[in-house]
Amino acid sequence: MLRDELLRSKNDEIARCLLSRKRKLSELYFATVGFAGATENAPTNALYHQKEQTFLDANDLTKGRYFNEATLPPFPDFAALIPRPEEQHSSLEITEPVVQTDDVSSVIAPKAEGAVRGIAPSFQQQEGQTAQVIEQRLVEDSLKKDDARIHQQPALATTSEIPQVANSPTTPAQPDQLPQKASFAVPDTPPTSTSHESVDASVSPALKGLPPSEVAPPRAVSNQLPSAQRKPESRPSLVLAQPSEDQPLSPASSAGPYSNNTPAPVAVSPDTSPAEEVTEGADEVALSPKRVGPVQLQPGLVPSTPDEQLQLEAAQSLQQNALASKSIGDVTTASSLSNEVIKEDVGPTPSAAADSSKETQDQTSTSVEAPEPKRPDGVVVAPEESQPPAQSIQEETQSQVGAEVKVVASTTPAGKKPTAAAVLPAQPERMTTRVSSGAIRHKSVSEILGETPKPSAVQPEKAHAIEKPADMVRAPASASPESAAKMRLKDRKAREKERSKLSTVVFPKQQQQQQQQQEKDDSLDIVRQYAGELARLNEEQDYLFTLFQNKAYAPPRGTNLSTLLASAHKTLTTSNHLLEYQEQMDCRTLRRIYALQNANRWPLRQLKRSVEPPRQGTHWDVLLDHMKWMRTDYREERKWKIAAAKSCADWCAEYVNSDPEHRALLRVPCRIPSKFEKKEAHASSMISPPEETTEEMLVVSQPTPDLIPSAEDESVSDGFNDEIRHDIRDTVAPAAIFSLGSDEFTFSLDMTPAAQKLLDELPIYTPVKIAPGANVPMFEQPPDSAWKTELLPVSKYASGRIKFHETESPRKRSRYDYSQYDSNPEHGMLDLPPEQTNVALFRPENKPIRDRIHPGHSFRPPTEYPMPSVGFFESRQSSQWTYAEDDELRRLVKEYSYNWSLISSCLTPSSQFTSGAERRTPWECFERWVGLEGLPADMSKTQYFRAYHQRIETAQRTVLAQQQAAQQQQQQQQQQQQQGGNNSGQAQPPIRRRTTQPVRVDRRRSSKHLALLDAMRKLAKKRETMLQKQQHASHLASLRKVNDANQPKPPISSPAEFSRLKYDRELKLQERQEQYRQQMIAQQRANLAAQRAGQIPSQQPMMNAPPGRTPNGIPHNPGTPGIPGATPNGMHNGMPNALPNGIPPGMGVSQGRPHMQGVPAGGPPMNGPIPPNPMAMKMMPQTGMPQGPGGRPGMPMQTSPDNTRVMREANRLQEQQRILQSRQQQPQPPQHQQPQAQQAQQQFHNQQQFGPQGSHSPNMNLPNVNGTPNNPAMMAAIQAGSGMQSPSLHNAMPQGVSTPSPRMGQPNLLSGGVVPTISSIQSQIQRSNPNMPPEQVNKLATDRLHQYQQQRMSQVAMNAAAGNMASVQANYQVPHDGNFQSPQPGMNGTPGMQVPQSQGFSPMMRVPQPAQQNRMGVGNSPAMNVALPQQSRSATPQTQRSGSAQAGPVPGSSKSPHPPQAQIPSG
């Protein structure tokens, strides 16, 4: 369907073109063989139609036949068509009383009229050939009759090109009335003639070939022809108004045929050269002799102007096809174009002649598309002469628009008289129209097609040869001093030069064509829609466009816009939400409409209107159309008349207020034609034109040069060749019609191809045209188009479209609306004019001067800012530049002349957040510009730019080195991973080489909004985290406050109470020590007895493993002279890493062995039944066994004062009783610590931890059990690490615990190792008794723990006394926790002596130890295992306990006056 519509439109267009061509051919045929009565709708005979149809068929384009001039019929015999002289005389008598002309005028008139009569048939000819034949015949006839009366005017010459200045003998006597300006009278018109013919004599195309002097008076001959003899197809000739002699020339018409004060009528065609003037009473037409180039030249004559050359060539080419051998017709290059332009200068005249000075009815022929047939000017139709003057005005209005002839009658600025000389084809045709004919967009045709203001005095070379003699005559007057009139004329000349420039007007398509194209497009859009194709989706074509956008940008599974707005991170106002809500409402409505349309339930959905044949136009339609056209035409004509009257009044005022000298410049010379000459002209016009053609041509060729005065002839001939160049330069530009002033209502235009193109593009307002063949009106729009639309407008929504306006209706601004929150601030900006106009700084027209005075375009860097450092160039992120930004940078640099600060501000984005990719600092812009354009050669060598380039290059090298290092490191890591077989699943991407210089990108990824949102999200999360922490801390603080308030504080004990507690504790300690002493004595006795008997206890294999299993271990041979003398390698190999930090590796095992009571230092080795873990047996160190240097082969002697005093005290107190020693050094029993001194133990829990950290057993605080500290540095470390404050060396733990301080209120953790057990017991008690207070729970748990430990200690003591080491070990391994392990043989020495890496034997004494798995291979000395680190279960940091776990002597032992005592648990 779309294809059919396109095909139909093209076919219609072809049909219109063919119809227009056929109509123009009909007009051509009518102009060639017209007959009287045809133009008055008289019934034409069948023969005419038959011949016309034959002619049309011979040139039918549809049959492939192009136009052929040979198909035109020969011209009819005008002698048979011309009426009798009586009729002609009666038709021209109307103006005879006012004719007052000398002989020269009467001589000129017949010849001119002959030309006027002959020129009309060529009005519609494209080539003008046949018109020339008629011109030749008519002119020859008229010239033959008047040959005897011609004295000053030469006859028509076909070969003469010399300008003829018709100077009569009376010319010197009449200085104001030049002979060339011969005026003629228009005879009266009989009652049967129309006002056109009664006033206008038709202009003959023969004037084209006439010399200027003969062309000047064309009226007499035409008026002498009877109306019956004139060609019936003739167009009513136009009337020339009476010229005002004393008015100055208008700048718009100084080079044209008429001045502004002498409005010229519409001459029918540019091909014709009618200089017609209707005289009312005394109407005058002064014909200035104008140079006209004839078709044929004598061998010695050369065309004087380019236009004449063109005319000559065209005429010679046409003469080859002429029907007669001597054709005088002259055709211009624009002859085919000129038939659509009519010159019309209407001057207000009171008589009927003035009324007939309007247009002819054939404006339809002037329209661009379909001009109507036009009547030649040389033929006067009798029936047409009966038309009223008003009708003739109406008819001529159309013809003036379409074909305006430039009548060369304009006067020179020096005061030439307006001439009515015809436009001869020898020069570019000019047209002058009135300003307001209403035919062109409510403008006058003069405004659009008027002639340019070219002063003829300044531009005598304008190829108007008739004007040149007048210029020469007035030359002396122009040499007078400059006056106001001269100055005004000079101004007009300057304006004329401006108009002479080349055209810059773009010719748009005509409105009709645009409307037709728009209608075609609309119809095609409708066709596309009905054909099922998708119409263009935009707001103008589819009201469902909003719904489409909503569907396109809101996918089915996507997030709705309302949801996004609800969770937006930006601040949204009510208007933002309302906009989205309104869009939802619109989409909901459109969706419902769409659904109803698909269901055929939408009431506005209409069926396509049925195709009906268009209604034929009726007479009423034509009448209404003509009424509209006439209304517009009269309205615009009235405007033009007002403008013309104003200008004439201004000229009159200027003339009145001028002095006589200036009045002479403003005066137009003319004279009144005589009545006698008009009558003579009638008689001469009766002779047949062909009879006198040949003789007349001979006459014309010779006397022409004699008619020009020698002085003027010389001046004209001298300037002729030069004028050719000036004519080319001063050609009026067609575009000048658009720059006319308000006081210019006439305009002269050269008929050049450009001018013709301009005229063709101008839309012409014409009434409806009548088809020539069908005789039906041709409406541009169908008569019923006003109501017969595509859709029946049942509602305003049927033909209208829903449009959504972004601009809201004006409303009162709320106090909450501020200008800085306006989303579109650019709408509020006003373009204010500058306050001072005398400042040239910012005025663009002064830029060249400003640049010349202050050269601001010199190259310079942004020196107002310091040059960036090398560090910046190394660490910056590359800025990204798109192609558009590069072009904008170039433009700004050129416009703002290296003002980098201004350039930077123009390129910097408006956002406050600027990413590195959008960095547009002055130096960044400069660097980018240098990268694009490069530095000037002289600038790049300066020190400043060398430093600049050096910084950039240094930064680039640094960045490149960093990238290479990173790549090498990455490659090495990858190689290591591949060699180790540790290939990860995904390889690391290679490091991308980045640059720091500006780079060009096709599209810059705008991630600043994402980065901004990400930063906002992180900040919000950080704030939330901080808030949560604060809330949690405050919650914990509140809970602590509640617990502290509820927990009763312990009462502060008095010194007496502390003394009592101390006494009770010491008593219990003494009792326990006594019990333990007895057990130890029994054990020692049993061991001694066994040694004497040579029996090895059953536990010996466990103690001394076979040497094979314990290489380098301590031998278990009973004959071994003692452990100190044992293999030292055993010490070095067995326990090099397990010794305490303060014990050197060479120390013997014996120094760490606790000596039994009564056993000397050098006694037999302890190969007896010692349990694997000697800490399980509460042995009592014997101070009576000195440990001399001999007993310590690998231990250096300690010489510190503390050690010396300790040793001395030990020797002095050796002899004291063992019971007293044991009582003094007995550690506090656990049952005394908790129930009686709970608070004190809580305050000194850190000191309680020291004892277990120093040793695994209370009776073995140090590796050297005998109390000799080994390393003071180690003691200091132990003291600093544990914070022990005990004044005793060996009773560090009991003494520290037994001296509680009431100043410290720390929780009672007892020892580090006891906490888990107490906690478990407490949890059991709490589960069984949930209502028991915490104090009772703690007390009960401590009691239970003490009972349990007491039972175990008792069992251990009994087993030790019985010598059953295995049972001791078994008892020791009572699994109160899961960390205890049995001895592991085969590791670093005697396996039996290996102590498991778990808690100590006593839960009370368990201390957290650092997580070290170093085990010490101890031979037979159980004391060496004291330094074994233990696995920790307490909360004390292991870094704090590491030193104390491996400590040797207890710090502060030098202050203790008591020797070390055995520590025996009670009970």
UniProtKB/Swiss-Prot annotation:
Q: Does the keyword Magnesium apply?
A: no
Q: Which PROSITE patterns match?
A: HSA (PS51204), MYB_LIKE (PS50090)
Record-linked Pfam families:
HSA, Myb_DNA-bind_6
A GO cellular component annotation here is: NuA4 histone acetyltransferase complex
- Skewed-composition ranges (Polar residues): 155-174, 244-263, 330-339, 388-401, 1254-1271, 1428-1445
- The UniProt regions of compositional bias labelled Low complexity, in chain numbering, are 475-484, 970-979, 1175-1186, 1216-1226, 1233-1253
Its function, per the record, reads: Component of the NuA4 histone acetyltransferase complex which is involved in transcriptional activation of selected genes principally by acetylation of nucleosomal histone H4 and H2A. The NuA4 complex is also involved in DNA repair.
Listed name of the protein: Chromatin modification-related protein eaf1
**Per the UniProt entry, what species is this protein from, by scientific name?**
Aspergillus fumigatus (strain ATCC MYA-4609 / CBS 101355 / FGSC A1100 / Af293)
